[in-house]
Curated annotation (Swiss-Prot):
Highest taxon, organism lineage: Eukaryota
Record's compositionally biased regions (Polar residues): 270-280
Region annotation CAHS motif 1: where it falls in the sequence: 184-202
UniProt subcellular location: Cytoplasm
Residue spans of biased composition, Basic and acidic residues class: 294-303
Protein name: Cytosolic-abundant heat soluble protein 3
Organism: Ramazzottius varieornatus
Amino acid sequence: MSSRQNQQSSSQHSSSSQQGGQGGQGVQGSSSYSRTEVHTSSGGPTIGGAQRTVPVPPGSHSEVHEEREVIKHGTKTESETHVVTVPVTTFGSTNMESVRTGFTVTQDKNLTVAAPNIAAPIHSNLDLNLGGGARAEITAGTTVDLSKIQRKDLGPEEYARYKAKVEQLARQDEQDAGMRAAQYREEVERDAELIRQILERQHIRDLEFRKEMVENQVNRQEREIQLEAEYAMRALELERNAAKEALESAKAQTNVNVKVESAIGTTVSKGAIQTSADKSSTTKTGPTTVTQIKHTEQHTERR
């Protein structure tokens, strides 16, 4: 029953509005007119309609504007001295260039704002059983019926002014909502650009960190190779000194026998050669070093 009454009240509202409009146009100059009555279907009127689509004015980032910026940042390497056979000092620098491109764009969409609705009427029903076959029913409720007010106070002209004021309020609200949406969009675009720039700087820092780690590993391997070469040279020097000392302290002996048969007879020549070495050296800590070497003595025996 309530839905059927609501449909009937809605049809009465539309028919009465049409009759009021036709009466106002057909009887211009006369004193009689048809009163417009508005019956609400939900017990309370709605202000400004159910929903409104608010247009947002375009901003500075409504189109794609690509930015291009060349960032040059170089690093200087410390001077290093590598002793191979001749001291060599190398000075170097690395120039690294990053090309940053980017843009910020906002795809605008219509802002849909729901209009407030006046609360539905409140009804309460209390059924009391008093005993002895007696009963009492109490009904209480609150409602706002705009049609009663219009029957008493509003004519067609006043209702038209009321509708014009409602539309003006709606347009002003749409304009204010569009300006607030544009301001919020600018804040979002500014924050998005800031986040993008922070991530771009992080990209450059990541490259520099990777380069630094690789250089540290190369330097460590170079120091390991130098240390290994140093110990290899030390071992080779020890072997060379041991071989030299063995040669210097070695002893050798050779026996020589010569026998010649000739027409005049037999000639025999015998001999022996013995070689020995004894090295002695004295080292003093100071500006000079004195080394004494005992030369090899050779003995030859002839028989």
